[in-house]
């Protein structure tokens, strides 16, 4: 009786379960079909979208309402790959679609996306969607936030977007959009002037052109930010812009605007940021004393009329940053200019300012940087206990031998080494970082980009500390699972003055975030819930792919029976493996000695990663003892430098050969598989103009790469005079050609092809014959690798050499190497680093160049060594043309490296030299002893050649 009652109770519970399930389950049929289409297209969702009922079992990233209709899809930073299926248009109740940070989502947007008429939030930021923005997007009349930035959209802005009357956030920056800004015709055609509720026009870094329509702005608009920077707008600034009373940030810099700067801007009394640099404005700078809230004023690089330093600037009481570079200012600088209480940065370089510079006694206590290089200043009256970094190079005062060693004649603009990462003694594994308590965890990382900060320079770190405190206050108040935050590698894009902060967000309570937690953090940035401190301006945050989710969600669905079964099965399997292992070990010992003789990788110590010995091309495996002996136990005397990867040591083998050993530090150690892949790749690279890998060491928990030793150091050492090498014009041409051949080989003849990703003068070495050799593949990527289109938000490469497109796409390609090489070519001309004392060599050459004059009128920029030792600079103009083609802002307009090599070879012929006298063409110089067939990986050690 008791048994039957238990069975009856069990049946009752089953029945009750299905009754409850029937109430709270069964997703709407059409919605399920649409989600299934997404799942089929984005196969990475197959693990988290398992059940047959998305609403009933809460598929990750899916939210449903009480009617089992899908109302939200939030799949940020999920490594999604593929396209956006047209079936998504059937989700008629969808209100939120957030696919932020999936850089392998591509293809055009579905033309029927306008069917999602209840959509209020659409964010596709940081993907790779292309093609035109569909006209149907104008049907999304409930939309309040639209983020299409950091994609590859082309074509024009649809006029239909003027119907989005509820839109507040409108961000289409960092795309390839072109054409004019659409405005309404007063009848049936809508336009952007109808967006009266919009607070943000973020249109920067596109190809938009034509005049900015007078009709675009009106007093009824509620705009806070107008970011039109980095486009191709022409004509004058519309007077109507002065009617937008709420405006706080205005960026019109890096366009082709002309005419007078309108005095109507003085009506924008709430304006905090005004950027008008790099245009073609003429006339005088109008009096802007009504802009009492202004933090930043930048009118640099405009052909304004000759005039004195404006006397009204001291009345801008909130001013923090003042940039009036190259606008024909003359006369003295009044001491009152430095008196605004919040003033931190003043840059008036490349003007006609004269007499003695005097900061006075009432200068701002916040002042830390004054740049008046390239003027006609005859003296400097330095205040007592002066904390200000003053730069006066290229002025008359610095021509006096008595002043040439003074700080103000040699000062350099400070770079940031600021980091708030906790310094802990222990080393964390790959992907982990120490949190505030020195526990190794997996942080959420990404780049926090300030699009218009009202502070500049890195000498005052208080701004960044306030930022960190502000973030933690936000996370704590919102009860986010965040233990701490940290910053590192803060940098400023020299093109648009965007400030890039590499941000680390550490999980609380365990070593990683789960998917829900990561989504909530990303969402806080995407919908701008987080408000940074004053003066930080508009921002975006693009997170790196997070692939180490906590499995806590999945563990809840695993039954105890399954767990027990798995444990029992594993135990039995381990016993069988142990018995088999004992037998195999006995057999292995018998052949160990012979194997060691035949295969130097028999002692490959891969730890827990079992793998075949790497396939190598004439490369030797060294033991730790061998390399320790040849470097005197890695003594400081043998330490010749280092970087992010680790230290480099000079060593001498028993046969007398000198070698360079790259010894990885703990923080940059790779897994065994990754290290194997790298040495297999490097061993197959054989070219006269590429540094040769001689061997490697994977022993005693060490990872080392052994290269041929290059005695004359780097090209940067040569240009700076550090290695005592005199580089005349012909030597520089040969160095350019040699390094170009090396890169062309990597791009086009190496198999698989390689993108270097960090081309710079420090990574071009000079041997005893001054033959250039491309070095340092620590950041290289295989072009044929799955990561060919790898997009990362962690800043790669080196500032000054970075492809401008990288700041928009976070993607490095072969054309990124071409850009870096173009910067090196200009560096060969000037002898200076690409960013020297705050000046960017690319911008300086373009600004000073006059093709109608001898040597393009660039004599002032040339390294004096060229002029003193070279005589007639044949081929100079053609060389400059090639270099400037390489540094075109858009990769599609740059040549390939093989095309660059052909041009450089023709220049050497013009000079009267044989381009192949000292080195073969890049095809012939490969010196590959194995032939192209050996480049195909077979997974076995190659048979030695007789």
Swiss-Prot record:
Domain of life: Eukaryota
Extracellular face residues: 26-561
Glycosylated residues in this chain: 246, 267, 287, 354, 362, 415, 460, 489, 514
Membrane-crossing residue ranges in chain numbering: 562-582
NAD listed as a keyword: no
Signal peptide boundaries: 1-25
Membrane topology type: Single-pass type I membrane protein
Similarity field: Belongs to the protein kinase superfamily. Ser/Thr protein kinase family.
InterPro entries for the chain: Kinase-like_dom_sf, Leu-rich_rpt, Leu-rich_rpt_4, LRR_dom_sf, LRR_N_plant-typ, LRR_R13L4/SHOC2-like, Prot_kinase_dom, Protein_kinase_ATP_BS
Keyword entries, A-Z: ATP-binding, Glycoprotein, Kinase, Leucine-rich repeat, Membrane, Nucleotide-binding, Receptor, Repeat, Serine/threonine-protein kinase, Signal, Transferase, Transmembrane, Transmembrane helix
Residues the record marks as active site: 758
Residues given in the record as ATP binding sites: 640-648, 662
Reaction(s) catalysed by this chain's protein: L-seryl-[protein] + ATP = O-phospho-L-seryl-[protein] + ADP + H(+); L-threonyl-[protein] + ATP = O-phospho-L-threonyl-[protein] + ADP + H(+)
Location of this chain's protein in the cell: Membrane
GO terms, molecular function: ATP binding; protein serine kinase activity; protein serine/threonine kinase activity
Source organism per UniProt: Arabidopsis thaliana (Mouse-ear cress)
Protein name per UniProt: Probable leucine-rich repeat receptor-like protein kinase At5g49770
Cellular component, GO, one term: membrane
The EC number(s) this enzyme carries: 2.7.11.1
Residue ranges annotated as Cytoplasmic topological domain: 583-946
Chief place of localization: membrane
Domain Protein kinase as annotated: residue spans: 634-908
Ranges: LRR repeats: 67-91, 92-116, 118-140, 141-164, 166-191, 195-219, 221-244, 245-268, 269-293, 295-314, 316-340, 342-365, 367-387, 389-407
Region (Disordered): 919-946
Pfam families given in the database record: LRR_1, LRR_14, LRR_4, LRRNT_2, PK_Tyr_Ser-Thr
